[in-house]
């Protein structure tokens, strides 16, 4: 401790105010804790400021532009449809600003103290918080680390004005004429699709056999087909990016496919090959917190580290880097600190891709269930047999419901189709609530809605489908 530096005491110190940190702080405050949040950048973290929210705003804008140009089959013809990309970016920023202001209001309303700066552990009960002009020591009874992650930088692709990470891609001032995306996961596919809808010529380089490798092949193949149908998208699988040559007006990317070296010229190259946990500048070694070789913090089922009063949540612990996973873990950690018997259960946590069509998955896939030796029923229902999907002109896709054969218990679901991101929540509820396929089939769903697809898939699972022939 620096001479003259009087420490400020708090019950629970939260490091990071992203979707995990600010939720943890609010829940801890609700449970009677005096809470302090330390945030080095902007409230809301990556998700709200340079991730989930702005990317979905950009995707929505691109989708609307695409629809305006291609609704001839409905009798709608629009001429001279144009994009003012400056206004698109201004609108996107307004969405973000409303939400960051909302987070600030929620923290204030719950009497959470917010401190700007970077926290560094001194010991297991104190941190040093530093900003540009000062430093202050904070002591705590418990701490929750929620510092998130950052994009991985490839050795031969150093970030610059032309070599972008996801943050840079969201901040472009112009619509690229041509964009190369390295990595066909959910981030690359979402951002690539958004720009392709604005008219950008898109080239995706994916190292695996399929884009979106975390999803079943039948699902990712639907997305691949829709992308290629646009006419301005190339997808190279089993491709290895080798290097980039930058010019003032663009880049030349070198890559290899099946031993053959190729090049492609573009305005920009976007790198989306994963994210790295932000655990390397916190002084975790000062308190002996155990981590993996990848910098992932080891935790138990209450998000507690090996140091009993220090917890970790979100992208810095095991599991997919999902905002809603971090928020869930934040609540669990706050409740554990308060002495409540809360434990994490990841089976009901969904994963979503805002592609075309959207993809969503929760619980077991058919392959995973079979690998574990489970006796299951995998029931499918197509979007093309649903009235609402037809009226929306969104007939690509299907729902697959995974149930346990012995009792019909819902243990998983996959959706490829319009509004899959909204539909998956009912299946998460089914898993969390221990519901059976019969429970869903007997639940009255409004007509005509996409939600009926869930009911229809459940009817298939119990052997009594109405709108498809057995």
Curated annotation (Swiss-Prot):
Q: Where does this protein hold NAD(+)?
A: 183-187, 206, 272-275
According to its UniProt record, which residues of this chain constitute the active site? 447 (proton acceptor)
Q: How is the cofactor bound?
A: Binds 1 FAD per subunit.
Question: What InterPro entries does the record tag this protein with?
Answer: Class-I_Pyr_Nuc-Dis_Oxidored (IPR050151), FAD/NAD-bd_sf (IPR036188), FAD/NAD-binding_dom (IPR023753), FAD/NAD-linked_Rdtase_dimer_sf (IPR016156), Lipoamide_DH (IPR006258), Pyr_nuc-diS_OxRdtase (IPR001100), Pyr_nucl-diS_OxRdtase_dimer (IPR004099), Pyr_OxRdtase_I_AS (IPR012999)
The set of disulfide-linked cysteines is 47-52
Give me the Gene Ontology terms describing cellular component: cytoplasm
Instruction: Identify which top EC class this enzyme belongs to.
Output: oxidoreductase
Q: Where in the cell is it found?
A: Cytoplasm
> Per its UniProt entry, which superkingdom is the organism in?
Bacteria
Swiss-Prot/TrEMBL catalytic activity:
N(6)-[(R)-dihydrolipoyl]-L-lysyl-[protein] + NAD(+) = N(6)-[(R)-lipoyl]-L-lysyl-[protein] + NADH + H(+)
> Which cofactors does this protein require?
FAD
Which residues are recorded as binding FAD? Answer: 39-47, 56, 119, 315, 323
Q: Return the SUPFAM superfamilies for the record.
A: FAD/NAD(P)-binding domain, FAD/NAD-linked reductases, dimerisation (C-terminal) domain
Keyword annotations for this protein?
A: Cytoplasm, Disulfide bond, FAD, Flavoprotein, NAD, Oxidoreductase, Redox-active center
Q: Which function does this protein serve? A: Catalyzes the oxidation of dihydrolipoamide to lipoamide.
Family as reported in the entry's similarity comment: Belongs to the class-I pyridine nucleotide-disulfide oxidoreductase family.
The miscellaneous comment for this protein is: The active site is a redox-active disulfide bond.
Q: What name does UniProt use for this protein?
A: Dihydrolipoyl dehydrogenase
């Amino acid at each position: 401790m620096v001479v003259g530096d009087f420490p400020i005491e708090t019950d629970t110190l939260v490091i990071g105010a992203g979707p995990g940190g600010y939720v943890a702080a609010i829940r801890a405050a609700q449970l009677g804790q005096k809470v302090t949040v330390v945030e080095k950048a902007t409230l809301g973290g990556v998700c709200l400021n340079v991730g989930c929210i702005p990317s979905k705003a950009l995707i929505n804008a691109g989708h609307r532009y695409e629809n305006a140009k291609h609704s001839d089959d409905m009798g709608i013809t629009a001429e001279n449809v144009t994009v003012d990309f400056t206004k698109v970016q201004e609108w996107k920023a307004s969405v973000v600003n409303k939400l960051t202001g909302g987070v600030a209001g929620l923290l204030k309303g719950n009497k959470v103290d917010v401190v700007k700066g970077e926290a560094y552990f001194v010991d297991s009960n104190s941190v040093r918080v530093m900003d540009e002009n000062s430093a202050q020591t904070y002591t705590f009874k418990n701490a929750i680390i929620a510092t998130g992650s950052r994009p991985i930088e490839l050795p031969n692709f150093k970030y610059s004005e032309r070599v972008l990470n996801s943050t840079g891609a969201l901040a472009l001032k112009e619509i690229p004429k041509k964009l190369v995306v390295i990595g066909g996961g959910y981030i690359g596919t979402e951002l690539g699709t958004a720009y392709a809808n604005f008219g950008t010529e898109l080239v995706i380089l994916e190292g695996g056999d399929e884009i979106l490798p975390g999803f079943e092949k039948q699902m990712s193949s639907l997305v691949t087909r829709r992308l290629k149908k646009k006419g301005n998208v190339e997808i190279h699988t089993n491709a290895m990016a080798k290097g980039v040559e930058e010019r003032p007006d663009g880049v030349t990317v070198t890559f290899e496919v099946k031993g053959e070296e190729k090049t492609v010229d573009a305005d920009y190259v976007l790198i989306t090959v994963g994210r790295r946990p932000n655990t390397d500048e916190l002084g975790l070694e000062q308190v002996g917190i155990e981590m993996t070789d990848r910098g992932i913090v080891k935790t138990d089922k209450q998000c507690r580290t090996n140091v009993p009063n220090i917890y970790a949540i979100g992208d810095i612990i095991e599991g997919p880097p999902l905002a809603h996973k971090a928020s869930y873990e934040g609540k669990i950690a706050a409740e554990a600190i308060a002495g409540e018997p809360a434990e994490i259960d990841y089976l009901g946590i969904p994963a979503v891709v805002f592609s075309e069509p959207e993809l969503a998955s929760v619980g077991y896939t058919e392959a995973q269930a079979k690998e574990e030796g489970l006796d299951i029923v995998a029931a499918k229902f197509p979007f093309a047999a649903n009235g609402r999907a037809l009226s929306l002109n969104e007939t690509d896709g299907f729902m697959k419901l995974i149930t346990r054969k012995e009792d019909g218990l819902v243990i998983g679901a996959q959706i490829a189709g319009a509004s899959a991101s909204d539909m998956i929540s009912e299946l998460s509820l089914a898993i969390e609530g221990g519901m059976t396929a019969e429970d869903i089939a007997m639940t009255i769903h409004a007509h005509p809605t996409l939600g009926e697809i869930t009911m229809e898939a459940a009817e298939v699972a119990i052997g009594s489908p109405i709108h498809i022939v057995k």
